[in-house]
């Protein structure tokens, strides 16, 4: 019998302010990788995380 793939999937969170902000501490885009349960959270995930490029806590959204 084949195994079930499971409900947890790997996602990437990207800083929303890095692309539009020109006054950054360093060039680049902050990204975090994490897991989410697709049954409990079917919509896109949004979390406040620390961005080392902006040097502050910003909103990070899920990307594909």
Curated annotation (Swiss-Prot):
Gene name for this UniProt entry: rpl33
Keyword check for Plastid: yes
GO cellular component, one term: chloroplast
Protein name: Large ribosomal subunit protein bL33c
Top-rank taxon: Eukaryota
GO biological process: translation
A molecular-function term among this protein's GO annotations: structural constituent of ribosome
Keyword flag Ribonucleoprotein: yes
Pfam families with a match to the protein in the record: Ribosomal_L33
Alphabetical keyword list: Chloroplast, Plastid, Ribonucleoprotein, Ribosomal protein
Stated family: Belongs to the bacterial ribosomal protein bL33 family.
Taxonomic lineage from the root: Eukaryota, Sar, Stramenopiles, Ochrophyta, Bacillariophyta
Localization (cell): Plastid, Chloroplast
